[in-house]
Amino acid sequence: MSIIKPAIIIGNGPSRNIIDLEKLVGKAPLYGCNALYRDFNRWDYLVAIDSGMINELHKDRVDNGDLIIPPEEERWESIKYNSNGRRRTNAGMVAADYAIRHKNNLIYLLGFDFILDGEDSVDNVYKDSKNYGPETHALEEDNYNRMKYFEWFVHEHIGVSFIFVVPDHKIEHCKSVRAGNVRAMTTSEFLKKLEK
């Protein structure tokens, strides 16, 4: 039996707003995405893949914790997934990849709202702020490709468990992921687990 090594990836979907991120500190390594530093500075790793955000981080001299700015090659879907017409990935997927590289085998996904139905699935807590203009807004139809890539990614990491943390009232509105190593958990259940 292997030792469970959890990590928490903090995405930028609005569902993460119901969690006091301070309560996560010290429970597991925290991997944040892009502009998280604007609201919360106790992350262990912060991942940025877009030029505007990378410039903002450098300009603001963000250096608490480890800043992960992957090489350009890692800012796109894996060539193993799609060698032709690779799509840009997102900081959350890159953060999950780095968490696995750091030997974590239980990945909690907060604010990964593409798992939800409807408009909530494409909203962002930083929408319409600096570096989050209309050109960055996701569309619901983008979720099909996001989900397909996520399913491929988790199949590539079959020894890792992935848990989407979603608001209690949205648990019935999660999309189905075709992978045995993925499930959803309510925010209440997640917070109780942290208290143990």
Residue ranges and their predicted role:
Residues 1-196:
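Metal-ion/cofactor- or nucleotide/acyl-coenzyme-handling active-site neighborhoods
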